[in-house]
């Protein structure tokens, strides 16, 4: 074993792992296949490309993902520094300009004196170095075969990408600005109200639409947080109205009442020239997307700069294969990080990369790997991912249901605040030791 670390994959997890290891004085080689090869879902040449939504979800500590963000900020996360520096208006959420975000991370990685960035596809895992595999949900076929030889079969499912429209193509006479319950600046989202007749027609069109078929060998298992819009419609006619099209907290200023349903558009860039359709990940064919999404009031003449699409997501059976340190049980010099471990979400991926990077650096220095305290958001997530039911393991977002209970009686409305307070105190004590 050498004193070097090899990291495969320049996504959020890989870049966070690189940063943490290099900042601890260890030389790191990062392998990223772009721009020599692109997956079907990637378009930017830079590192840390966001391929699904441009939102890192809620900021409030009332949400576990908000707590995880704060933990990572306190721990010196590169991904959180990039997100804070490139944010765009998004109400109570943290959304970013994805091109600026990628550029920020790329510049930091390229200019770190202890990082060697190697552009090109990798088809094998080094046999001597400490290695972090952070190849993400779109692992190349060659490397996937090598990983499969080490870990056994992977399970495939699809994530889904939402369409983006230009702001200038929208009919603003039919759209109103507002954030749900007035959060954020109060007008961060564009809202397209639908009456009952419009909603029913929209659902009918989605249900009858032509979809891109999955290939026979690919098992389709959708994670709830990125469910295709047509899949939701198939669950029931009201599902969309209680999901991404829910109107609660969004009174139409022209009527003073909540519409029957609302399609929300969120800024895709700082300039506000592009908006994505929130929750509209889809595997509808491109012609059907143009036809059906232009049924939405205000989008009749929408110009689509990107249409929705589906891409494969590959993840290992983490509880069977990984220790809580993210080391492979069968070969402790190999660590995994990111969505390939079964964490779901940008922030969760960054968190797993943080821990993998810290532990890889500790291995180089001859120190014992560490696990975050269970009471922290990162610790609760890591513990779940590596200790879940092996037979029924599925990807998981961070959530307060993963946390150990508080001691004593706590009022329900105070519970999350107390969990967050405890977590940050534990995090502050722990981070000084790693």
UniProtKB/Swiss-Prot annotation:
Listed as disulfide-bonded, the cysteine pairs are none
Name the UniProt record assigns to this protein = Methylenetetrahydrofolate--tRNA-(uracil-5-)-methyltransferase TrmFO
Q: Which GO terms describe its biological process?
A: tRNA methylation; tRNA wobble uridine modification
Q: Which residues bind FAD?
A: 9-14
Look up the EC number in the record and give it: 2.1.1.74
**Which species is the source of this protein?**
Geobacter metallireducens (strain ATCC 53774 / DSM 7210 / GS-15)
Name the UniProt key words of this record, in alphabetical order: Cytoplasm, FAD, Flavoprotein, Methyltransferase, NAD, NADP, Transferase, tRNA processing
What does the UniProt record say this protein does? Catalyzes the folate-dependent formation of 5-methyl-uridine at position 54 (M-5-U54) in all tRNAs.
């Amino acid at each position: 074993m050498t004193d070097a670390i090899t990291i495969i994959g320049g996504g959020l997890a890989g870049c966070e792992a690189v940063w943490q290891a290099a900042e601890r004085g260890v030389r790191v080689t990062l392998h990223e296949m772009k721009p020599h090869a692109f997956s079907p879902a990637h378009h930017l040449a830079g590192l840390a490309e966001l391929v699904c939504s441009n939102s890192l979800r809620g900021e409030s500590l009332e949400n576990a993902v908000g707590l995880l963000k704060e933990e990572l900020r306190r721990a010196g996360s590169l991904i959180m520094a990039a997100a804070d520096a490139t944010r765009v208006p998004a109400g109570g959420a943290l959304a970013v300009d994805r091109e600026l975000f990628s550029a920020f991370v790329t510049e930091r990685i390229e200019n770190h004196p202890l990082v060697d960035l190697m552009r090109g596809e990798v088809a094998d895992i080094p046999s001597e170095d400490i290695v972090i595999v952070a190849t993400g949900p779109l692992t190349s076929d060659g490397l996937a075969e090598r990983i499969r030889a080490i870990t056994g079969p992977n399970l495939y499912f699809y994530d889904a990408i939402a369409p983006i429209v230009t702001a200038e193509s929208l009919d603003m006479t039919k759209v109103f600005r507002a954030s749900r319950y007035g959060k954020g600046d109060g007008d961060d989202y564009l809202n397209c109200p639908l009456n009952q007749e419009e909603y029913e027609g929209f659902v009918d069109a989605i249900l009858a639409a032509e979809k891109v078929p999955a290939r026979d060998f690919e098992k389709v298992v959708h994670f709830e947080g990125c469910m295709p819009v047509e899949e939701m419609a198939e669950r029931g006619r009201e599902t969309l109205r209680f999901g991404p099209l829910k109107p609660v907290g969004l009174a139409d200023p022209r009527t003073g009442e909540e519409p029957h349903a609302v399609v929300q558009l969120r800024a895709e860039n700082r300039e506000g020239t592009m908006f994505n359709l929130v929750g509209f990940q889809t595997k509808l064919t491109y012609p059907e997307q143009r036809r059906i999404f232009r049924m939405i009031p205000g989008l009749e003449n929408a110009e689509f700069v990107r249409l929705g699409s589906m891409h494969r997501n590959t993840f290992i059976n983490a509880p069977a294969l990984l220790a809580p340190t993210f080391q492979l049980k069968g070969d402790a010099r190999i660590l995994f990080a990111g969505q390939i471990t079964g964490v779901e979400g940008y922030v969760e991926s960054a968190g797993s990369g943080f821990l993998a990077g810290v532990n890889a650096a500790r291995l180089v220095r001859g120190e014992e790997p560490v696990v975050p305290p269970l009471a922290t958001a990162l610790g609760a997530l890591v513990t779940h991912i590596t200790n879940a039911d092996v037979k029924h393991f599925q990807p998981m977002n961070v959530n307060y249901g993963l946390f150990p209970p508080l001691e004593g009686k706590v009022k329900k409305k105070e519970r999350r605040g107390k969990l967050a307070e405890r977590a940050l105190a534990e995090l502050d004590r722990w981070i000084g030791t790693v």
